Amino acid sequence: MVNATVARNIAGICGNVISLFLFLSPIPTFITIYKKKKVEEYKADPYLATVLNCALWVFYGLPMVQPDSLLVITINGTGLAIELVYLAIFFFFSPTSRKVKVGLWLIGEMVFVGIVATCTLLLFHTHNQRSSFVGIFCVIFVSLMYIAPLTIMSKVIKTKSVKYMPFSLSLANFLNGVVWVIYALIKFDLFILIGNGLGTVSGAVQLILYACYYKTTPKDDEDEEDEENLSKVNSQLQLSGNSGQAKRVSA
């Protein structure tokens, strides 16, 4: 049991490192936005989605939902703060119409999390019931966000080019999924297994596509659209790592 606990902790630590990398990977995108003083065609969608997921996991880690989950709050709180900084930069350099859209989405997300929190605390009265209820929402959103890379993978196949699918994030996607799947199997956890199983499959498919189309990719410089697509893929990758972390401290 001690060895299993150590193995789970090691897997969790590795997952945390990868998750932090994924949280920070959009930085080049926002450096570009800051230098140009405008958002151009970049979209706030992936960052808004990550804010919602992080907020749900922070709530999941609270003592009244899942006791002894301080690290859940820490890692997802960190991710939430990072994403809010990204959105603040995006908001500052956006035209008025896009500022309104971002603001309305953030308000909507706050209302949604508030409704989930209220229902959790009023309708469920045990930690197991509450953690299961909130965990289901977290897994649903993680699963939905794995749909995002499908458009990028489709573009890779159509263009026979991997310029829109950076190898580093594809590899991080795969490793992140594998680490948390291993963690989930050491002491079976369905929530972790579902989300990160999807992450493993998604990462594996991306790596296979990369191997197939790397040689047919034009050897030109990456453009800004690469960074935008990179951040879209990145948004859901960091989430599956966080879902695994949420279970590690509660074991």
From Swiss-Prot:
Domain MtN3/slv positions: 12-96, 133-216
Keyword annotations from UniProtKB, A to Z: Cell membrane, Glycoprotein, Membrane, Repeat, Sugar transport, Transmembrane, Transmembrane helix, Transport
Region called Disordered, residue ranges: 220-251
GO annotation, cellular component aspect: plasma membrane
Biased composition (Polar residues): 231-245
Family that this chain belongs to: Belongs to the SWEET sugar transporter family.
PANTHER family: RAG1-ACTIVATING PROTEIN 1 (PTHR10791), SUGAR TRANSPORTER SWEET1 (PTHR10791:SF30)
Protein name: Bidirectional sugar transporter SWEET4
Source species of the chain: Arabidopsis thaliana
